[in-house]
Regions:
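Glycine-rich phosphate-binding loop signature in dinucleotide/nucleotide-binding domains
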Residues: 77-82, 104-108
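Short hydrophobic core segments
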Residues: 87-88, 99, 107-120, 127-129, ...
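A conserved short coil-to-beta-strand element within the FAD-binding core of flavoproteins
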Residues: 83-97
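An anion/pyrophosphate-binding glycine-rich loop and adjacent beta-alpha core
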Residues: 7-11, 134-137, 147-207
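Short, basic, low-complexity termini and linkers enriched in Ser/Thr/Gly/Pro
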Residues: 93-95, 101-108, 167-172, 203-205
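Short loop/edge segments at beta-strand edges and connector loops
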Residues: 81-85, 137-139
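Glycine-rich loop(s) and the adjacent beta-strand/alpha-helix scaffold that form part
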Residues: 111-153
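Conserved N-terminal/central alpha/beta ligand/cofactor-binding core
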Residues: 1-80
């Protein structure tokens, strides 16, 4: 459905909602925050709705609504959207950047944004390391719990609207809805716990 943003306009509280990197986001949210996001979409005739937990979605409940809006903006602004190109190398050149593509001519740009994606996209992190950036080891986050040997799976399909979940031998806990699945546990509370406890769980080898 595309969870566009969260209905929180207090920048301090918004930063606190990020398990990692919240302090670094403060200056960015001071320039463009939740209210700006809502206004941006409304100015393009995309209305958002707020659910009980504060998450905001397009009233259509379809992610395609957001995709269509963003694509329309690229067309309106005459942005050259290039797909299916593989970047082999990037280097800083003067005040700009030189990108070397696979089987294509080298191109020059004033600035670049590197969206590395998940931890499987190692090449993006290697580029950043080569440019002198320090990279914190990427680890899984926002995942469900696979519990193959637990009897709780017998309750598959059960939804508990108000549950409190905690990582064993840790102070990290969250509250909210959970869903019992055929593989273990899922739902907003579980996903949030996996985000806040990502590094603790990695140290425990997700056991």
């Amino acid at each position: 459905r595309c969870n566009v943003t969260h209905n929180c306009t207090d920048i301090s509280k918004l930063c606190e909602a990020y398990p990692r990197g919240g302090k670094k986001l403060r200056s960015l949210f001071s320039q463009f925050n939740t209210t700006d996001t809502i206004d941006w979409f409304e100015n393009r005739n995309i209305l958002l709705k707020t659910e009980k937990d504060g998450r905001m979605f397009p009233i259509s409940d379809k992610s395609q609504t957001i995709i269509d809006c963003l694509v329309s903006e690229t067309i309106r602004l005459k942005i050259d959207l290039q797909l299916g190109k593989s970047i082999e190398q990037m280097n800083q050149q003067g005040e700009g950047w030189k990108l070397q593509f696979k089987n294509l001519p080298t191109q020059h740009f004033d600035s670049i944004i590197v969206a590395t994606g998940g931890s499987s996209k190692i090449k993006g992190f290697e580029w950043l390391k080569d440019l002198g950036h320090n990279i914190a080891a990427p680890i899984p986050s926002l995942f469900t719990f696979n519990m193959p040997n637990e009897s709780i799976k017998n309750l598959m399909g059960l939804v508990v609207e108000k549950a409190k979940v905690r990582i064993l031998n840790s102070k990290i806990q969250t509250e909210g809805p959970i869903l019992i699945t055929h593989w273990g546990m899922s739902g907003p509370a579980i996903l949030k716990l996996s985000a806040w406890g990502a590094r603790d769980l990695a140290v425990k080898n997700w056991q």
